[in-house]
Regions:
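Conserved catalytic SET/PR domain of SAM-dependent protein methyltransferases, capturing the structural core
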Residues: 1-171
């Protein structure tokens, strides 16, 4: 997972809770395209209601090849931490489990639940991008993302000068 502008890397033990992040491999000027990526899991942004939303997620997931699914399951899952403490967003787990009970999938419920959790953790308004999901969040970001309709991909651009070895952050 390397490009000329950034490297996805694991942080050292001093900030281990961050996991992976994107580090600039050279100076990046404001306005520079850092990443253009088509989502591995593309969703219809016009779905209404939980069932349509979840159906759309599983349709996209089931269209992935096995390599893409493996990479998808390597993404962060906010719920791993939550399951240890058993503190969920109010009712979210119940919504997931009710949907899965009413709409069983041809794979174990645990896999289906993990799909929903990973989308919730890494999704942007119309899907999940494997590389872009490795960019960390900051309220003081140095890059921004948007949907590029001309190429049907998500673009990440520097919004300020990024020095070599700085982390690239998204809002």
């Amino acid at each position: 997972m390397e490009s000329q502008l950034y490297l996805v890397t694991k942080f050292g033990p001093e900030i281990e809770e961050k996991g992976l992040g994107c580090v600039a491999q050279k100076k990046i000027k404001r306005g520079t395209l850092i990443l253009r990526e088509k989502p591995c899991l593309l969703q219809n942004i016009n779905t209404t209601g939980n069932n349509d939303y979840f159906d759309d997620i599983f349709t996209a997931y089931e269209e992935m090849d096995s390599d893409l699914k493996d990479r998808f399951f390597e993404l962060a899952n906010f719920y791993d931490h939550i399951e240890e403490s058993n503190v969920y967003h109010i009712g979210r787990r119940d919504v997931y489990l009710t949907y899965l009970e009413e709409n069983p999938k041809p794979y174990p419920e645990g896999v289906a639940l993990k799909v929903l959790q990973i989308v919730d953790t890494n999704g942007f308004h119309n899907g999940v991008c494997l590389e872009m999901s490795r960019f960390n969040h900051s309220c003081v970001s140095n890059a921004e993302y948007f949907w590029n309709e001309d190429v049907n991909a998500r673009d990440v651009r520097a919004i300020k000068y990024v020095f070599q070895y700085d982390l690239c952050f998204l809002p």
